[in-house]
């Protein structure tokens, strides 16, 4: 439908493309300043904000979350560390009572639920992707320590100083340049896999054994609550766009994200402004947890502190490539940095494709790019 693609190499923009349409009826063309919901790419942005607080000594990743957020420390959550929230091993990957979808702008309703609920598994026992809860968990930590929301913090500390076109929580004035997202349900692919639960392990490869185990635990449908998909247009509503959902509703341009990851891949500094120190970037892009991920179909995802280091079937972590860190989004958007190439890469789109084709375009673009610059 529509997309933008940008690459920053050694602090220079070498690719900046956009085209297609912003809506299903093809009445609005995708323009240079069109922004789009990048979904879970937002997690990387949220992690960057927390990284700034970590390197300033305001947060210690090895301390318990309850040290900063006392109300959180109950029902088995007493020992969960900040690090475990960041690397998806905290056991808080879903809402036990289901996710409220009637008022996305009510931050406190999500916080109260997370404070009161019990863990799904012992902290550190499994890697289980915190698909939506990640944003409220990390966002509340930031708010407790700094006083600002994630959207406010990123705007003040990163976006405005570096002229990066990316926001978590839009204003109504942004709606005119915002592309609609055409979503498909994730449930058909999940339903196609369910028969694996009844296939004897003898007939399964290791990767399908992991998928079978993940399906049996049913963490997948817990984390990706089916009620969200009852109205697949919810991501285009004013309520969703105005809310701050730091795991899933960041909006921006490919140019902005390529610039951001380009800076982080080149030491974290542009001119006199330092986003993160090199040692912080290095720590955040180290592998801190390794799959099989019990939410992401048992696949061997590798996570740093909020960053994906290896994401199967996407450009991030493909074989014979550099040291990558970034994130993907459920509608097909991808942004990452490569420290070996001092490069930032971003492909953003507004039409979700099915299953194995979800990241097909970004993989092909990344492969073509590396064939040129290698």
What feature does the model see in each segment?
Residues 11, 34-62, 138-143, 257-260, ...:
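Active-site SXXK
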Residues 184-254, 282, 286-340:
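Active-site Gly/Thr loop motif
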Residues 31-33, 117-124, 134-136, 237-246:
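Flexible glycine/proline-enriched surface loops and loop-helix/loop-strand junctions
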Residues 32, 37-41, 53-97, 115-116, ...:
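Active-site helix/loop module of the DD-peptidase/beta-lactamase fold
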Residues 245, 266, 280, 285-293, ...:
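Short, gly/Ser/Thr-rich active-site loops of penicillin-recognizing serine hydrolases
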Residues 88, 134-141, 244, 248-270, ...:
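Active-site-proximal alpha-helical segments within enzyme catalytic domains
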Residues 1-39, 60-63, 116:
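Short, conserved catalytic-motif segment at the N-terminal edge
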Residues 327-374:
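Structured C-terminal helix/loop/strand segments within mature extracytoplasmic catalytic/sensor domains
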């Amino acid at each position: 439908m529509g997309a933008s693609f940008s690459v920053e190499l050694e602090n220079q923009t070498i690719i900046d493309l956009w085209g297609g349409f912003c809506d299903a009826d093809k009445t609005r063309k995708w323009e240079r300043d069109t922004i789009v919901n990048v979904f879970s790419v937002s997690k990387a942005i949220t992690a960057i904000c927390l990284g700034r607080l970590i390197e300033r000594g305001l947060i210690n990743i090895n301390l318990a979350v309850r040290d900063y957020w006392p109300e959180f420390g109950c029902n088995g959550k007493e020992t969960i560390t900040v690090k475990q929230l960041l690397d998806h091993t905290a056991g808080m990957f879903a809402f036990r009572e289901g996710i409220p979808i009637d008022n996305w702008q009510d931050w406190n309703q999500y916080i109260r639920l997370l404070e009161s609920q019990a863990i799904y598994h012992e902290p550190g026992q499994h890697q289980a992707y915190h698909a939506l809860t990640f944003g409220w968990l990390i966002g509340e930590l930031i708010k407790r320590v700094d006083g600002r929301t994630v959207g406010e913090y990123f705007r003040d500390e990163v976006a405005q100083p570096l002229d990066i076109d990316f926001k978590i929580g839009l204003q109504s004035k942004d709606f005119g340049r915002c592309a609609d997202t055409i979503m498909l349900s994730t449930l058909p692919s999940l339903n196609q896999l369910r028969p694996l639960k009844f296939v004897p392990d003898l007939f399964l490869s290791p990767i399908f054994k992991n998928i079978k185990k993940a399906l049996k635990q049913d963490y997948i449908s817990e984390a990706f609550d089916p009620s969200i998909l009852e109205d697949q247009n919810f991501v285009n509503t004013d309520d969703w766009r105005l809310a701050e959902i730091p795991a899933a509703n960041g909006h921006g341009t490919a140019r902005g994200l390529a610039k951001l990851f380009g800076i982080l891949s080149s030491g974290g500094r542009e001119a006199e402004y330092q986003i993160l120190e090199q040692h912080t970037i290095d720590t955040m892009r180290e592998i801190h947890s390794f799959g099989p991920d019990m939410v992401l179909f048992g696949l061997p995802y590798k996570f740093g502190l909020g960053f994906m280091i290896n994401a199967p079937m996407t450009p991030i972590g493909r074989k014979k490539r550099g040291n990558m860190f970034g994130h993907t989004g459920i509608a097909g958007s991808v942004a990452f940095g490569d420290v070996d190439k001092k490069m930032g890469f971003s492909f953003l789109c507004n039409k979700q494709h099915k299953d194995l084709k979800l990241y097909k375009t970004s993989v092909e673009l990344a492969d073509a790019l590396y064939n040129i610059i290698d």
